[in-house]
């Protein structure tokens, strides 16, 4: 993959937020850091060890540091990237900006839901990024995330990431 992971993490912080205490997201799911779903994904023993935290109860009581949140997000991005490449190997051939956009979208909605954007994927395979960007906006996801979808669709169209 060509995209800069540190830029992606900054975009995810902007889009998802950075919360160092456990909170409930809009669906009532316990979440922490940069959108880490504690009910589906949790925090592995290895991640707790890497963060120097004894157990998950400590996370619920005291929260995590920004460095911990970034570590969790980097691990999540790695998983999302692997899932996305298995589902759509063509992502590896895209430029860095468009890779970043698709990883951002997959991070937000999950790869299974992103796979349902069939017209967008057909346009990406044809390198028709004008149509791909329009298909991004013609979705329930776009109505849910509003400005995020507009920014990402513009970047898909132009090949340039702004702001």
What does each of the following model-derived ranges do?
Residues 26-54:
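Substrate-binding/active-site groove segments that recognize
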Residues 51-88, 96-103, 108-114:
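Alpha-helical segment that forms one wall of the substrate-binding/catalytic cleft
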Residues 9, 29-31, 99:
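A residue-level signal for beta-strand positions that form part of recognition/binding surfaces
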Residues 19-23, 86-97, 135:
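Surface-exposed patches in mature extracellular/periplasmic domains of secreted proteins
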Residues 31-33, 101-104, 131:
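Structural recognition of the beta-strand scaffold that forms the well-ordered cores
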Residues 1-21, 27, 36-40, 70, ...:
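Long, amphipathic alpha-helical surface segments
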